[in-house]
Design a protein with these regions (language model features):
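Walker A/P-loop nucleotide-binding motif
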Residues: 96-118, 132-133
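A short helix-turn-beta junction within AAA+ P-loop NTPase domains corresponding to the substrate/partner-engaging
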Residues: 124-126, 217-236
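Conserved catalytic segments around the Walker B and adjacent sensor/switch elements
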Residues: 123-133
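Pre-Walker A adenine-sensing motif
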Residues: 79-96
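C-terminal alpha-helical "lid" subdomain
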Residues: 1-59, 63, 222-223, 233-236, ...
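Sensor-1/coupling segment of RecA-like P-loop NTPase cores
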Residues: 101-108, 194-220
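Conserved adenine-nucleotide phosphate-binding loops and their immediately adjacent elements
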Residues: 67-81
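Mid-core helix/loop region of P-loop NTP-binding domains shared across ATPases and GTPases
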Residues: 136-137, 142, 151-189, 195-201, ...
């Protein structure tokens, strides 16, 4: 190998980067994108023919490899059987069985999205759509079309007809996460097209403002409100649920450690999971086997609560 290249770094990089057929974890294209280079640069580096600034490239590679090592060591918190998951499961089941509309609301961090993804993973018939503030009626219908495997090209009317045809008679339920971002007309489109015309159950999930939006009589949502058969309101994380989540990672910790975690998380599932991740990082740095109050306090200082 040329003296221009760091042989050890080169070997370490290509132990991770390459094709899946070679058993590599990350493709050259993804590595190039992460590093801010073209695929051609990585190919040239692999063949030791790169004639650009090798030192700068290798500095970026070294820093990226360290970040990847940290990512691999990130704590994977198993999905626990919480009351939020059970409530969502019940609401979705009713909506699907009865072809009804269900609304699930909860503050940010109550575990809605995690529970929905878990339900969609368990179910063979749930269609999960995660919307964002940029979604228009057209974007929404195109996303639904893609999710159910129908052609989303062409005018909106054509896409709507394909969606109706595909869903009619199909044992399915459409779950829309972050539905509070949808406009009034998009919510009405879901009611008319998905629920009315295709007779498919719909579950709208979002922040509490979703309920206010639907109930607002200044908007033409009376028909939507009258179709809602289930309304679920998720509260703060319950102590028993928090213990289940923590015990999924650290079994047999003292009661006071559970209490410290719960107090620091302040009723938020998302905060608890992030807190556990930071605790795991600090434990690794301190070579600790179990979490303690001092580590939890240090981890809590890194979170916005």
């Amino acid at each position: 190998m040329s003296d221009l290249f760091d042989g050890e770094l080169y070997k370490k990089f290509f132990e991770v980067v390459g094709s899946p057929e070679e058993g590599k974890r990350i493709s050259q294209a993804k590595a190039a994108q992460a590093l801010g280079y073209s695929g051609g640069v990585i190919s040239a580096y692999k063949s030791q023919a790169y004639n650009g600034d090798v030192k700068t490239l290798e500095k970026k590679i070294a820093a990226w490899l360290k970040r990847e090592e940290r990512r691999l060591d990130r704590l994977d918190v198993p999905v626990a059987e919480t009351s939020a998951l059970e409530k969502i499961r019940r609401a979705v089941t009713i909506a699907q069985d009865e072809g009804d509309i269900a609304v699930v609301i909860g503050d940010s961090g109550t575990g809605k999205t995690t529970a929905l993804r878990q339900y969609a993973k368990e179910s063979h018939s749930a269609i999960l759509i995660e919307v964002d503030p940029s979604f228009s009626q057209v974007t929404l219908m195109n996303e639904i079309a893609r999710a159910i495997g129908v052609d989303h090209k062409g005018g909106q009317n054509a896409v709507v007809e394909r969606v109706i045809e595909s869903l009619t008679g199909r044992d399915a339920v459409l779950i829309v996460d972050e539905a509070d971002y949808l406009s009034d007309s998009s919510l009405e489109l879901l009611r008319r097209v998905i629920n009315d015309k295709s007779k498919t159950g719909v579950v709208l999930v979002g922040l509490p403002r979703l309920e206010f939006k639907i109930r607002n009589l200044k908007n033409d949502h009376q028909q939507l409100q009258s179709r809602i058969g289930v309304l679920v309101k998720l509260g703060k994380l319950k102590k028993a649920d928090a213990i289940s989540i923590i015990a999924g990672v650290w079994k047999g910790v003292p009661t006071q450690i559970f209490d410290t975690f719960i107090q620091t998380a302040n009723g938020s599932t998302r905060t608890l999971v992030k807190l556990m991740g930071r605790v795991h990082q600090i434990m690794g740095l301190n070579k600790a086997n179990t979490p303690d109050a001092e580590i939890i306090a240090e981890a809590g200082e890194l979170l916005m609560r």
